[in-house]
């Protein structure tokens, strides 16, 4: 595990089928350039929660385009459980999930540009409108609220959940995480290791 890509070369990084980003993204220029090259050449990425956080101070247009969403807009606080609804069962990441489930407590991020409005994005799960208003200190009152999606131009999945340990203990959510990991790895240009 690492919190930076400094010290890695592209030849080293391309040997990995997937980068799992738990609540962080590359912040220094060297790491950003390496991550861009890795993803533009078929790399895989599974991002959780704050790994997608970006605001006007992030200054990384490529990453915003890669994520398929705009800058951070709002969040609920404190973390709370939420009803999530599956957008499609046609995608391998959601094929065996229930139509809806209650996710463990998390802080959910909402974006200035909705991922669903991006032609390159396929939304897989959405926070149900039944949750509104959501929060106590910081309140989200409504709006379209995708929480899991893929940018179809890349081998990537973003998962909004992951604010604390509880996010990783729910059976339905564990299945979502496992499906996402397997889907990304199975599409590796080097071949599907699960077929061996």
Predicted features along the sequence, with ranges:
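Catalytic beta-strand/loop cores that center a nucleophilic Ser/Cys/Thr
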Residues: 77-153
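Structural recognition of the beta-strand scaffold that forms the well-ordered cores
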Residues: 1-2, 17-22, 39, 44-49, ...
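Extracellular ligand-binding/catalytic regions of CAZymes and related secreted enzymes
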Residues: 130-147, 151-196
């Amino acid at each position: 595990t690492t919190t930076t890509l400094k010290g890695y070369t592209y030849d080293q990084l391309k040997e990995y089928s997937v980068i799992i980003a738990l609540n962080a993204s590359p912040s220094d220029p060297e790491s950003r350039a390496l991550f861009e090259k890795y993803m533009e050449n078929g790399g895989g990425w599974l991002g959780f929660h704050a790994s997608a956080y970006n605001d006007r101070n992030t200054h990384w247009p490529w990453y915003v385009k890669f994520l398929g969403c705009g800058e951070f807009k709002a969040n609920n606080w404190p973390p709370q459980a939420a009803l999530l609804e599956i957008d499609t069962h046609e995608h391998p990441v959601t094929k065996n999930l229930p139509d809806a489930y209650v996710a463990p407590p998390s802080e959910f991020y909402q974006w200035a540009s909705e991922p669903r409005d991006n032609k390159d994005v396929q939304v897989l799960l959405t926070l149900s409108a039944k949750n509104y208003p959501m929060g106590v200190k910081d309140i989200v009152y409504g709006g379209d609220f995708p929480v899991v999606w893929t940018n179809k131009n890349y081998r990537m999945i973003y998962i909004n959940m992951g604010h604390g340990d509880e996010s990783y203990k729910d059976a339905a959510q564990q299945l979502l995480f496992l499906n996402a990991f397997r889907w990304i790895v199975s599409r590796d240009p080097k071949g599907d290791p699960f077929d061996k």
